[in-house]
Amino acid sequence: MTLRVLGVDPGLTRCGIGVVDIEKNRRATMVAVGVVGTSAELTLDKRLLVIAQAIDEWLDRHEPDVVAVERVFSQMNVSTVMGVAQASGVVIAAAARRGIPVALHTPSEVKAAVTGSGTANKDAVTKLVTKILRLDAPPKPADAADALALALTHAWRAGSGMGAASGNSSLTPAQKAWADAEAKARRKR
């Protein structure tokens, strides 16, 4: 059984999208990769619409079993975080409309899964994604490589077997702590 994962490195300026097929033996093959760009001159609603339309097209064309999205962190500046969060929301909603499970992975989880180090730089991630997927050339820009890395991370962390399509199966301790904290915060409201 092959698992198809659509990975998304969300962003308003550049949104990386990659589709990977992963076999039970963890062998991965790139199906497609690209970047959706939006102009800063467009209004926010128009930028999100461009991303939404592209994501809809990718989901319908590639029919993934699961969507893996980079989890937003507040370490960045506020305007960057907002843009990433808004783009993430568009992606998550598009998948939800189709009944496709969504999993969120932190940048550190992705780096660790692909390179073995949670502090690896973008060049190391790109180099290993290129090697793992047996590509002739590195995916460019880095957002494209990051999207493929997200897809690989989800498949490997969730296990490419039966429960892999579920966004909540096989959570890491950090993901479990995060999910528990979010659930606790929701109960307090």
From Swiss-Prot:
Region annotated Disordered, chain positions: 162-189
Organism field: Paenarthrobacter aurescens (strain TC1)
Name under which the protein is recorded: Crossover junction endodeoxyribonuclease RuvC
A Pfam family per the record: RuvC
Gene Ontology annotations for the cellular component aspect, listed alphabetically: cytoplasm; Holliday junction resolvase complex
Catalytic function, reaction form: Endonucleolytic cleavage at a junction such as a reciprocal single-stranded crossover between two homologous DNA duplexes (Holliday junction)
Subunit structure: Homodimer which binds Holliday junction (HJ) DNA. The HJ becomes 2-fold symmetrical on binding to RuvC with unstacked arms; it has a different conformation from HJ DNA in complex with RuvA. In the full resolvosome a probable DNA-RuvA(4)-RuvB(12)-RuvC(2) complex forms which resolves the HJ.
Lineage: Bacteria, Bacillati, Actinomycetota, Actinomycetes, Micrococcales
Bias-annotated ranges (Low complexity): 162-178
GO molecular function: crossover junction DNA endonuclease activity; DNA binding; magnesium ion binding
Family, as annotated: Belongs to the RuvC family.
Residues given in the record as Mg(2+) 1 binding sites: D9, D143
Basic and acidic residues bias: start-end ranges: 179-189
